[in-house]
UniProtKB/Swiss-Prot annotation:
Subunit structure, as described in the record: Part of the 30S ribosomal subunit. Contacts proteins S3 and S10.
GO cellular component: cytoplasm; small ribosomal subunit
Function per UniProt: Binds 16S rRNA, required for the assembly of 30S particles and may also be responsible for determining the conformation of the 16S rRNA at the A site.
GO BP annotations, alphabetical order: translation
Residues forming coiled coils: none
Cofactor binding description: Binds 1 zinc ion per subunit.
Family under the similarity heading: Belongs to the universal ribosomal protein uS14 family. Zinc-binding uS14 subfamily.
Organism in which the protein naturally occurs: Mycobacterium marinum (strain ATCC BAA-535 / M)
InterPro entries: Ribosomal_uS14 (IPR001209), Ribosomal_uS14_bact (IPR023053), Ribosomal_uS14_CS (IPR018271), Ribosomal_uS14_sf (IPR043140)
Keywords assigned: Metal-binding, Ribonucleoprotein, Ribosomal protein, RNA-binding, rRNA-binding, Zinc
UniProt xrefs under Gene3D superfamilies: 30s Ribosomal Protein S14, Chain N (4.10.830.10)
Protein name, per record: Small ribosomal subunit protein uS14B
Length: 61
């Protein structure tokens, strides 16, 4: 889990638009966040395996 202060800081609108960054909506992780889902790679994988993300399925070929 991310520190609450950093999560709150990221939620505020920055003074300059380029300073804004994405965080995982579930755990607050700042890196490897998929914008389409708003989740980090770890949470995305866990939720996809649990079937909590509609339209996402494990690929096999």
């Amino acid at each position: 889990m991310a520190k609450k202060a950093l999560v709150n800081k990221a939620a505020r609108k920055p003074k300059f638009a380029v300073r804004g960054y994405t965080r995982c909506s579930k755990c607050g992780r700042p890196r490897a966040v998929f914008r389409k889902f708003g989740l980090c790679r770890i949470c995305l994988r866990e939720m996809a395996h649990a079937g909590e993300l509609p339209g996402v399925q494990k690929s096999s070929w």
